UniProtKB/Swiss-Prot annotation:
Any one Gene Ontology molecular-function term assigned to this protein's record: ATP binding
UniProt similarity note: Belongs to the amidase family. GatA subfamily.
Stretches that traverse the bilayer: none
Pfam families associated with the record: Amidase
Enzyme class per UniProt: ligase
Signal peptide (residue range): none
UniProt EC number: 6.3.5.7
Species per Swiss-Prot/TrEMBL record: Pseudomonas savastanoi pv. phaseolicola (strain 1448A / Race 6) (Pseudomonas syringae pv. phaseolicola (strain 1448A / Race 6))
Keyword annotations from UniProtKB, A to Z: ATP-binding, Ligase, Nucleotide-binding, Protein biosynthesis
Quaternary structure (record): Heterotrimer of A, B and C subunits.
One BP annotation, GO: translation
Role played: Allows the formation of correctly charged Gln-tRNA(Gln) through the transamidation of misacylated Glu-tRNA(Gln) in organisms which lack glutaminyl-tRNA synthetase. The reaction takes place in the presence of glutamine and ATP through an activated gamma-phospho-Glu-tRNA(Gln).
UniProt-recorded name of the protein: Glutamyl-tRNA(Gln) amidotransferase subunit A
C-alpha cells in the first residue's frame, strides 16, 4: 500500500479497494517504525489524521469524489496549523501553536487530505542540507550518511522513503527542487503568487513560494491543483485562473522548443551530472522536442544577488521574534534590551544569526545602495535574460544541482560551499518563474535531478514535459533500499 503514488491512491479509494482510514493507519505505523532512522518529522498528528481519514471516508460514502479526498500527506513545519506546533525548525518557535491554518493547509484540508504530521526543515528555511534544524539533521534515505537537501529536507526524505505519497514544501532559492533532486522526487516551485503565502512563516517574502513534492509529475499536478489559486489575504497572490493541471499532462512534445543555457556547463558542475543532463535532453528529443542553445549572461551574478536580497528580507521578517509576544523567551531578563538580545541569541541557531547579520548589514545606512540596491538591479537583469530566452524557447532545461548529496557535516564549516549548491535553482526565485526538478539518474548510487523552467504561469507545461519524460524513463520509480 505504501508504494502507491497519489494518483494510484486516488483510484484505489474511488474503487473502494481500501479506505482512507486503513491507508492512514498503515502509513502511521511505517512512520513510527522507520522515521527514527531519518528524523524527517518534527510532529506527528496521529489523532487528527485518523479523524480526518474517517471524515474523508464518510464524505466518499455520501457520494463525494475528488482526487485528494482521503489522500495522506504532511506539511513542512512552517505552514501554520491551528492548535498544532509550528516550529519552523527553530528553538525560537518550539512552543508555538498557531491560532489558525495557513491557506495552503485549509485548502488541502477542505479537499479532503489527511495530515499525518509536520516535517523537519532547516531552521526558518535557511539552508540547503537540512542540518540547521533545532530538531537535528534529516538523513537521506538513499544513504543515511548523506544530507537530503534543504530546506524542505524532511518532506523530501519522508516521501522518498515511502512514508507517505506526497508533502508540501516551500522554495525560496531551491528548497523544493534541490531536495527533490537529491532524493529522487519530482518537486515543483510555482510562479510567484500562484500559491498563497498566507500563514506560511516568511523567510524572504519576495522569493518564498509553496509547492508540491511527490514521486511523479502526475502527483505534483494533483497536489498543485489543491494548493493553487487566488487568496485575498495574501497581497502578493495573483488573480489568475487555475487550469486543470492533470488535463494538460498528455500533450505531445512534438515541436516543443527546449533551451539549454551554455552558462550551465561551467567548472563547478560534476561532469557525471552534465552527462545525465545531456541524456535527458536526448530522451526529450526522441519525444519530438527541438533543442537549442540559449544564453543567460548574468547567471554568475545570481548567487551574490540572492545572498544579499534573501538575508536582507529575512533580517526584517525575523525582527518580529523578540521574546515578547510569542516564541522563546530567555530566563530572568534584566530589562527590555536584555530580553530582546538574549531571547534572540538563545532562540536562533548560528546559520539564522549569520543571515540576519548579513541582511542587516546590507540594509544599513551607507551600504544599502552598494549592496541591496545593486542586488535588485541584478535581479532585474536576470529576469530580462529569461524573457529574452523565452522569446526563443518554451522551456529551459539544465541540472538542478551541481553535485549529488554530500555527507552530513561535510559543508558545515564552509557555508559558501553550501550556498553554491543553489547555483541553478535561485534564478527562478529571483525572476519569480515556475521551476520543476525531476529524477534523471544516479551518480554513485545517489539520485540526480534535471530542472525545467518555463514562463510565468506555465506550470502545466512543466508538468507535461516531466510526465512525458516519466512515461519513457523509470528513474522516478526507483526506491531506496530498506524503505
Amino acid at each position: 500500500m505504501h508504494q502507491m503514488t497519489l494518483a494510484e491512491i486516488a483510484r484505489g479509494l474511488a474503487e473502494k479497494k481500501f479506505s482512507s482510514e486503513e491507508l492512514t493507519r498503515v502509513l502511521l505505523s511505517r512512520i513510527a517504525t522507520l522515521d527514527p532512522q531519518l528524523n524527517s518529522f518534527i510532529s506527528l498528528t496521529e489523532d487528527l489524521a485518523i479523524t480526518q481519514a474517517q471524515a474523508a471516508d464518510a464524505r466518499r460514502a455520501a457520494g463525494e469524489n475528488g482526487p485528494l479526498l482521503g489522500a495522506p500527506l504532511a506539511h513542512k513545519d512552517l505552514f501554520c496549523t491551528q492548535g498544532i506546533r509550528t516550529s519552523c525548525g527553530s528553538r525560537m518557535l518550539d512552543n508555538f501553536k498557531a491560532p489558525y491554518d495557513a491557506t495552503v493547509v485549509s485548502k488541502l484540508a477542505s479537499a479532503g487530505t489527511v495530515t499525518l504530521g509536520k516535517t523537519n526543515m532547516d531552521e526558518f528555511a535557511m539552508g540547503s542540507a537540512n542540518e540547521s534544524s533545532h530538531y537535528g539533521a534529516v538523513k537521506n534515505p538513499w544513504n543515511l550518511q548523506c544530507v537530503p537537501g534543504g530546506s524542505s529536507g524532511g518532506s523530501a526524505a519522508a516521501v522518498a522513503a515511502r512514508l507517505l505519497p506526497a508533502a508540501t514544501g516551500t522554495d525560496t532559492g531551491g528548497s523544493i527542487r534541490q531536495p527533490a533532486a537529491l532524493t529522487n522526487l519530482t518537486g515543483l516551485k510555482p510562479t510567484y503568487g500562484r500559491v498563497s503565502r498566507w500563514g506560511m512563516i516568511a523567510y524572504a517574502s519576495s522569493l518564498d513560494q509553496a509547492g508540491p513534492m511527490a514521486r511523479t509529475a502526475e502527483d505534483c499536478a494533483l497536489l498543485l491543483q489543491g494548493m493553487a489559486g487566488f487568496d485575498p489575504q495574501d497581497s502578493t497572490s495573483i488573480d489568475e485562473p487555475v487550469p486543470d493541471y492533470s488535463a494538460s499532462l498528455n500533450t505531445s512534445l512534438k515541436g516543443l522548443r527546449i533551451g539549454v543555457p551554455k552558462e550551465y556547463f561551467s567548472a563547478g558542475l560534476d561532469p557525471r551530472i552534465a552527462q545525465l543532463v545531456h541524456e535527458s535532453v536526448k530522451e526529450l528529443e526522441k519525444l519530438g522536442a527541438v533543442v537549442k542553445e540559449v544564453s543567460l549572461p548574468n547567471l554568475q551574478h545570481a548567487i551574490p544577488a540572492y545572498y544579499v536580497i534573501a538575508p536582507a528580507e529575512a533580517s526584517s521578517n525575523l525582527s518580529r521574534f523578540d521574546g515578547v509576544r510569542f516564541g522563546y523567551r530567555c530566563e530572568d531578563p534584566k530589562d527590555l534590551t536584555d530580553l530582546y538580545k538574549r531571547s534572540r541569541a538563545e532562540g536562533f541557531g548560528p546559520e539564522v544569526q549569520r543571515r540576519i547579520m548579513v541582511g542587516a548589514y546590507a540594509l544599513s545606512a551607507g551600504y544599502y545602495d552598494a549592496y541591496y540596491l545593486q542586488a535588485q538591479k541584478i535581479r532585474r537583469l536576470i529576469k530580462n535574460d529569461f524573457m529574452s530566452a523565452f522569446a526563443e524557447v518554451d522551456v529551459i532545461l539544465g541540472p538542478t544541482t551541481p553535485n549529488p548529496a554530500w555527507k552530513i557535516g561535510a559543508k558545515t564549516n564552509d557555508p559558501i560551499a553550501e550556498y553554491l549548491e543553489d547555483f541553478y535553482t535561485i534564478t527562478a526565485n529571483l525572476a519569480g518563474l515556475p521551476g520543476l526538478s525531476m529524477p534523471a539518474g544516479f551518480v554513485d548510487g545517489l539520485p540526480v535531478g534535471v530542472q525545467l523552467l518555463a514562463p510565468y504561469f506555465q506550470e502545466g507545461r512543466l508538468l507535461n514535459v516531466a510526465h512525458q519524460y516519466q512515461q519513457v524513463t523509470d528513474w522516478h520509480t526507483r526506491a531506496p533500499e530498506g524503505f
